[in-house]
């Protein structure tokens, strides 16, 4: 590794204007499926309504498990995952995704058991199926900045977002 002085001049610049710090995580307000059933080998479309206060929604991802596995003690055997395309040019607040069900996936009742959302300033929020806290709504997990202490706090609370279930048929 050799280092030597360059002839390029040092460049300095100043950023001006009003800045608004992005301290809040984005929020998912609704999740709706195109149908409550899907056949193996097909896909199931869904819409996620989400918003962010300053920088905008950056990324949304999800996981789904069979109901039995979501309620059971072991790790997932049947597991679906994916992400939602976020179009920054057309940020209407509604993001469309798709769950691809392969021919070998288990038939029966499934639940979207985990959603992650982040904004373009890397603030995130997770929504999880946590039956010990709520059997009807997702539990929201996120970090929140406390202006009084200057610290980030990790919080968990029941959200207003109802759990989403679907059935896979053969």
Residue ranges of predicted features:
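Extracellular acidic, Ser/Thr/Pro-rich low-complexity tracts
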Residues: 17, 35-39, 46-55, 66-68, ...
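Aromatic sugar-binding surface patches on proteins
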Residues: 88-100, 106
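Solvent-exposed serine/threonine-rich low-complexity stretches and specific carbohydrate-binding patches
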Residues: 72-90
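Proline/serine/threonine-rich low-complexity linkers at boundaries of modular beta-sandwich domains
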Residues: 13-28, 166-170
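Low-complexity/repetitive intrinsically disordered segments
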Residues: 1-13, 162-170
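Short glycine/proline/serine/threonine-rich loop/turn segments at secondary-structure transition edges
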Residues: 103-113, 122-124
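Solvent-exposed loop/turn segments flanking beta-strands in beta-repeat/beta-sandwich domains
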Residues: 51-76, 108-109
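Beta-sandwich strand segments
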Residues: 1-7, 121-160
